[in-house]
Amino acid sequence: MLYTTLLLAATAFSGADWPTFRGNAARTGASKADLAFPLTEEWVHSGSGRPQNAWPGPARHDLYNKVVNLTPRLWFDRAFYVSIADGRLFFGSSADEQIHCLDAETGEELWSYYTEAPVRFAPTVVGGKVIAGSDDGVVYCLRASNGELIWKERIAPDDQRLPGNGRMISLWPVRTGVVVSNGVAYVTAGLFPSEGSYVAALKVSSGDTVWKNNYKDMAPQGYLLASKDHLFVPASRSTPYVFDRRDGKRLRQLGGNSGTFAIVANDDLVFGPGKTGDMTEASGSGAQIASFKGQHMIVTRGTSYIHTTTELSALKREEFVSLTKERGELNKRRGELTSSLPNLSGADKSKAERELKRSAERLGEIEVAIRECILWRRVCDEPLDVILAGDALIAGGEDYIAAYAAKDGAKLWTAPVDGRAYGLAADDGKLYVSTDSGAIHCFGNPSEEEDSK
């Protein structure tokens, strides 16, 4: 695995609940919820149909650019991704156009709410409210207890429809989900750049607009992310955009690999995986910090976990950051010295040559030390998703899931599921798995749960 100047900033764990996609507004996929292995399947929900994807998978090869085995980049609706809060599980359905609520303990459906088009993204739950967007161009806010409508807001100014994926959808569908922070819900609407796309901030309490801006050159698709100051907007097969959360001003488009997987580490964004399976890390200011092989990443305060199509690995962050920073500075200095050599002579030239020799030796030492930053590396045949639950990494595969010890990568447990396990979530000692068959599996440890009562 090739790592190139990878700065991994610390990101806090989510709390006990999993109230939004990948647990929080940074989409870290990390939870404090401990799982007591071996887990037992407690229930399966499969009554909402099979996910109806907005886009087919990629062609196998890009012969023009000589790229084979293309990696999917638009993966946001391959399963019914779930949110969990206060003992209830919520998901949107692209099959039946509803927002569903299940009892997280039993899998019993408690209520559902019809929209007018597919709901492709997991809802966000905050303060007893469930907020979700639909392909009908509307953001819905429902009461978590009973599904009662509190407010709804159409983001675009008009209600125009057209056929899309065999359904009638808005000319401005909500294809980024909703991210909530400090009482404000951020959302986008739009898919066709020529028709304009809207980026908006709404008050969670009322749905009133805080700000709304229109852009004619972007196609927002993929889960929104938020840091302290910035809103990050994935842009389909293009690279993400950065917005100021205060007023919605678009600050820049990031360079690097495209794709709709992304996480925030402090104010850096890691995104990809690009069509070659490469990810990019960029700062909120736009500086590209890293490029590396990977499908998914989890960042914690001490260790970062990299998930590729074939491997799972752990990396010592602080040492790695220090070494890669030094390496970057040395390479920059070597470039300056090399450029200046033709213009030097005598003692100045000898001094520059000695510095180049010393820096080359130090770079060799740094490369060895960087390799030693890798705490462990394990073969992983489950490439579809990964989360961190307490001290275990859970990986999704085809028709099964697997758990690995975060401390050393040892395999702890496996279990079969119905379909490809694209969506994972953990809360209150339970693991929830969403697959491309439309199934949602719940795993728990009944003996541990009984002891805790």
Give each language-model segment a name.
Residues 12-453:
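Noncatalytic, solvent-exposed loop/strand surfaces
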